[in-house]
């Protein structure tokens, strides 16, 4: 059984239709991850259907999607909402997976960032991160500020995941994060369309290059480095 959650009900229903064809029982629950009450309702709903054994938290936005404020609200504060809401209902032996990004490793974690991260449970947590993102060197570039906010928010995902490892272990559960690199998704396509130079710079960081294209042929389709 799978519970799909997100803001776009049409996309969820399309995914549900595919799961139905595969014989997988699934449900949709429209949820704004940045809204703690909605996330709590999602956790309660999932628990009402049976044991919650796996929580895969993939929600996130990038500078190509939205502005600085929403990046912090969804990526950072949204992660807190998910962890805090699902920790109580996660069944023994369960696992929670949070999606970070390789972007988290492109910026050093300063003392100021650490202090802000440690205030995750304070009322002004969101505002603290917003202030740090506003201290970008190129203050005339909203895209630059949003890029900094993205890296910072994804670094927070790693921080908050690690912070909760022992807590989850106490109930014989696991929590971990993964950090995908650049691959072609609708979100990344927006970056290619709107910021081609930035997208090209990211592509150059993929060491596989042509080998990635060959790899796609091996698995049955022809693509490129961003396709895998």
Predicted feature residues:
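Catalytic loop of short-chain dehydrogenase/reductase
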Residues: 61-65, 95-170, 182-184
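Conserved glycine-rich Rossmann-like NAD(P)H-binding loop of the short-chain dehydrogenase/reductase
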Residues: 1-14
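Short, flexible catalytic-loop segment of classical short-chain dehydrogenase/reductase
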Residues: 105, 180-190, 194, 199
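Rossmann-fold cofactor-recognition segment
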Residues: 19-37
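Conserved Rossmann-fold cofactor-binding substructure of NAD(P)-dependent oxidoreductases
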Residues: 34-51
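Hydrophobic positions on the long internal alpha-helix
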Residues: 42, 56, 82-90, 160-161
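C-terminal helical subdomain
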Residues: 81, 149-150, 177, 197-228
């Amino acid at each position: 059984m799978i519970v799909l959650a997100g803001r776009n009900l049409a996309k969820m229903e399309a995914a549900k239709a595919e799961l139905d064809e595969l014989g997988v029982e699934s449900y949709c629950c429209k949820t704004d991850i940045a809204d703690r009450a909605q996330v709590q309702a999602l956790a309660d709903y999932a628990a009402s259907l049976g044991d919650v054994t796996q929580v895969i938290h993939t929600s996130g936005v990038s500078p190509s999607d939205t502005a600085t404020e929403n990046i912090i609200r969804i990526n950072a504060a949204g992660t807190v909402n998910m962890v805090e809401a699902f920790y109580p209902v996660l069944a023994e032996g369960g696992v929670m997976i949070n999606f970070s990004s390789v972007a988290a490793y492109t910026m050093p974690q300063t003392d100021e960032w650490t202090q802000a991260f440690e205030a995750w449970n304070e009322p002004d947590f969101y505002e603290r991160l917003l202030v740090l993102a506003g201290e970008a060197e190129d203050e005339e570039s909203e895209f630059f500020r949003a890029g900094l906010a993205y890296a910072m928010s994804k670094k927070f995902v790693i921080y908050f995941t690690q912070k909760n490892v022992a807590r989850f272990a106490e109930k014989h559960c696991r929590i971990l994060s993964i950090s995908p690199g650049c691959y072609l998704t609708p979100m990344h396509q927006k970056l290619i369309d709107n910021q081609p130079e930035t997208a090209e710079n990211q592509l150059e960081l993929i060491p596989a290059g042509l080998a990635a294209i060959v790899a796609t042929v091996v698995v049955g389709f022809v693509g490129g480095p961003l396709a895998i």
